[in-house]
Amino acid sequence: MKVRNPEQISIPASNTTKDPGLTHSQIIRMVNLVKKTENMNIFEELWETLRNLFRSDKHSQTAARQILKDAFYFQNCDGYSKYFTGAVDEKARDRFTHRLKKFNELKEHAKDPEMMQARGSISPDNMLCVSFYIGNIEIYTQKLQLGISPSTGGIDLSNAYLSGISLNGACLRKADLSNAEMDKISLCSSNLLGADLHGAKMNNAKVISSDLSDTNLSDTDMSDTDLDDTLLRNAKMDNTILNNAYMEDTNVRGINLSKADLSGQDSAKLRSRG
């Protein structure tokens, strides 16, 4: 998608001469369902505007349209109660999880998944913000207030759903990320000193040049994760899965790797680093 104007997303609609050219504010209005009297018309225009982001085969077009519709017409799902244990507001948790999951599902049908990004940040008062981007255009931002973990004293992200989010440069010192779902997350240049990631899933993640010293990574699945130039000093890694992880120049000083799954690693070389 080529953005002609930073104030406008204009994508030629498939099989039609209509080009809605929806503005940034109109898209936000659609997602928030402000004009409730014309929801269906708004959804149809949103779909016609965005459909060319997705592969043109019938399966992908049908699936993407339904996923977008599910995201647009939010309904509570009991399955979301297992996520974000530290969320202050349950309804906000459900909406947050729902839209992030649907965004990730949409990316699976995109012609260029890199054009669709979820960029996150964490404020000093423990507010998790995630903005959805198409290209360089921010189309929607959602926020979730989180509490303090009684076990670590840091932000409570236990059981969080953070898959696919870019949290580069985040300060997550002593964060509770136990049992979090973080597949394909990007945490490059982040500070996770003393964080608890026990039982987390981090397949295909990017954690380059980050500080994971003194973290609890026991039972964490980090298969295919890029840990290049990352500090893992004194991390606890009992039963940590590191299948095919990338660990160039990773500092593992003080780590007992005897119980870690090092499939795809040269364990002798790995133990000599740091």
What label would you give each PLM region?
Residues M40-R55, C171, C188-N191:
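Type III/flagellar secretion export determinants
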Residues I139-G274:
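Tandem repeat scaffolds
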Residues E44-E90:
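Low-complexity, charge- and small-residue-enriched intrinsically disordered regions
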Residues E7-A13, L100-D156, D266, R273-G274:
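N-terminal capping/linker segments that flank leucine-rich repeat
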Residues M1-M30, L46, L50:
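Non-Sec secretion/translocation targeting segments of pathogen effectors
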Residues I27-N41:
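Intrinsically disordered, low-complexity regulatory segments in eukaryotic proteins
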Residues T37, Y83-A87, R119, N216, ...:
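Extended non-catalytic scaffold regions that mediate assembly and binding
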